[in-house]
């Protein structure tokens, strides 16, 4: 008797949880910034960086969490950056939820150098033990095994 009730309860909880995510309403200010940002294509370009700073200033933590699942990779990455900047305690959980976010990439600009990065890679490096300012960044001991898991080099055969 307990098992059908438990299954029903879990299913109902999941259904409510999913419906809340789809019906989540961003504030008017956040919507405007996200709309502007979603037209950009390069992270760290001067235009998109200014929009990121606006997003950091207007979006609540809940909105940023929601935006880490946005359809545009640049919005997902900047929302993740903003959560790192705000020292969101569950930032690693969000990273792990993006382990399979490897289909789309983002263009990243560093001065005159431009490159592409998978969303998962971008988020992983945002938690780098040396360069991240987040309280919840990885330690070197935590970082290295994850790095090896995702980015191990194929050794040439002799």
Predicted regions and their residues:
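Residue-level detector of extended alpha-helical repeat arrays and alpha-solenoid scaffolds
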Residues: 45-48, 76
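Bacterial Sec-dependent N-terminal signal peptides
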Residues: 1-26
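Short N-proximal segments of mature Sec-exported proteins
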Residues: 72-87
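HEAT-repeat alpha-solenoid elements in large eukaryotic scaffold proteins
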Residues: 34-42
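Compact alpha-helical subdomains of small soluble proteins
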Residues: 98-155
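Amphipathic alpha-helical scaffolding segments comprising HEAT/armadillo-like alpha-solenoid repeats
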Residues: 30, 57-67, 88-100
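Core register positions within helices of long alpha-helical scaffolds
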Residues: 51-54, 82, 120-126
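Short inter-helical turns and helix N-cap capping residues of alpha-solenoid HEAT/ARM repeat scaffolds
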Residues: 71-72, 103
